[in-house]
């Protein structure tokens, strides 16, 4: 294996090289106070081309959706159309400031207002906030809204949130952050919420249920309406984790199912870039009875249009708002990208997105089910979960995932959901063609063969990447962020 030891920018430095030429100042030169100056500031000295090549080289160590297939289950790593980027860079969007008077940013506000309306139409909810920064933040917002609703009715006994055992870890985390007790609800033999267990847990101390549908097994809950009714019958509300909305676009509206509040992951369903911790966006939609609790402000129409004037957009405060959850108005650049994506697709196109996402996942499932065990094996939605082990071979899901990197594929999500042993969670998304799906299926089939004949090839994988297998636990626990500092750096 070749382990590339990357030179740091300090090691590339050579005295006298420079990448910038400062223009002559247009103000009189002045002496800086001695106290502000340092004799020793070991900044690297490099030409522009050295810096560009350094970072370009580093960027190639990263896998990206622009570089290859990225079937990371639950994360919906679909291709991000470049027109989204063009629109987000339009100066009228990119160079406005959230503190500008509303009269000067009517276009931005019209975009936000229209996006709120479109998300309402797509999801079947009565009102939407665009503030939350990501899905998990949307969950926190939604749970705070649920609590505020109970409280407004004088119903203060409710302290429990019900969460299925297949849920994403953010669900218990965001409920826990608001001080609620988490009650785990098991799944039944077909991967649905276990109705008997749900009934047993429902009483007048329940705030609600956090439901992911389709769930993280990629399965549509066969009793979703009954699940929602059981929770409503005990006075609880149903939170919808909307991370899997990609499977439903134009087909099912969560609001129509009776879900009370839900977050959207714009960076998943609506193709805004994610990965690497970049900004996401997690708007929250609510049914009519929760609209007045939304975070403040939301974009509204201050003066209706008439024959001479377009409408005047501005900010309005919901009557019993839970308050602000984000500085300014959310991640506006993501809103522009989402607006563009929805406008480019239109209703028919969005429905096709869901249909092809589901078709692609079922195609892969059909190609792989003979090779890998699929514990809850029924028609899947936009993703499915297989077991990452091979009969008679000593390999784990992690070995299979790492070996896929040698075939130039991003590994699927592994070891989640927790209820599946050695989970490999595969989400191809709609943007991949049949050739790519076939190549991926063939790689996984070949790896299953290798697991039996040359298992050490898997144990030591990946072999082709700049770095081999890293100790992920150690990397997380003992994160070293400043290894680039020169040894003699004056701390
Ligand atoms: C991604 C995801 C979340 C969290 O969303 P973020 O935008 O990453 O915070 C929650 N639930 C499910 C099922 C997810 O896939």
Question: Which residue ranges define each predicted feature?
Answer:
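Active-site-proximal cap/loop segments of hydrolase catalytic domains
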Residues: 338-340
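General small-molecule cofactor/ligand-binding pocket signal
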Residues: 129, 183-185, 412
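Short glycine-centered, acidic/aromatic-flanked micro-motifs in structured strand/loop junctions
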Residues: 132, 187, 211-214, 386-388, ...
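Conserved PLP-enzyme active-site core in the AAT-like
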Residues: 107, 138-312, 319-320, 395, ...
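A short, small-residue-rich loop immediately preceding and capping a beta-strand
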Residues: 126-132, 160-163
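Conserved phosphate/anionic-ligand binding catalytic regions in large, soluble enzymes, centered on
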Residues: 63-83, 131-139, 270-285, 289-290, ...
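Short linear functional motifs in flexible/disordered or boundary regions
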Residues: 67, 131, 150, 154-155, ...
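Non-catalytic terminal extensions of PLP-dependent enzymes
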Residues: 1-127, 144, 252, 302-325, ...
